[in-house]
């Protein structure tokens, strides 16, 4: 069953619960122990909803692409071939990617963009994210920033549920801006702590000028 029988909608809480159940089942039931072999069948050459893309400023052959359903993918071949990032980000809704002045990579999660009918009723609910992830080793590994993890993964109005856009200061290695569902936030310590540049309200974009 995909829809809530009472509302007729796919509820975020149901989706997250199913996601956790699948993860638990996969951990307990490895296909290798069942003697099963899997082969990818496609689809081929069909792009998903790619919300974010970044070309490494220190290595133009290296690119990052974020999907709202498939996580983060990395290319070292100018985009001709792609591999998924490490497993901590599989199936996360990637919404934004930015690179700090010193080359660190920040990835924002959670898709706040939704569809609605003429009466304002949402029929494609947003996908709650897991905050912001950071890489300090050129994308080899990513770690979650604890200060950005939503305190309730079943509550779409909670702070850090949706990080729609990230932007880095061009001169300050540790200064990052985040447009979120709960205000425009800023860190000056590389994501350890955040303060409100503008508190409250939903922000979906942020830009930093060339002069900072």
Residue ranges of model-derived segments:
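Extracellular glycan-interacting surfaces
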Residues: 1-212
């Amino acid at each position: 069953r995909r829809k809530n029988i009472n509302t007729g909608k796919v509820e975020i809480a149901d989706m997250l619960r199913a996601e956790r159940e699948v993860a638990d089942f996969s951990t307990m039931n490895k296909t290798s122990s069942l003697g099963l072999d899997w082969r990818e069948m496609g689809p081929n050459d069909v792009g998903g909803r790619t919300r974010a893309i970044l070309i490494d400023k220190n290595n133009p052959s290296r690119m990052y692409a974020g999907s709202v359903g498939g996580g983060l993918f990395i290319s070292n071949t100018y985009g001709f071939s792609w591999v998924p990032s490490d497993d901590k980000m599989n199936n996360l809704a990637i919404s934004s990617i930015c690179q700090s002045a010193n080359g660190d990579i920040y990835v924002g999660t959670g898709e706040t963009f939704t569809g609605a009918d003429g009466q304002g009723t949402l029929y494609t609910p947003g996908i709650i994210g897991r905050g912001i992830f950071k890489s300090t080793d050129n994308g080899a590994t990513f770690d979650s920033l604890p200060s950005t993890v939503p305190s309730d993964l079943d509550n779409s109005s909670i702070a850090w549920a949706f990080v729609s856009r990230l932007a880095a200061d061009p001169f300050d290695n540790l200064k990052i801006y985040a447009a979120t569902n709960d205000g425009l936030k800023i860190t000056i310590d590389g994501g350890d702590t955040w303060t409100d540049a503008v508190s409250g309200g939903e922000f979906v974009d942020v830009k930093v000028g060339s002069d900072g």
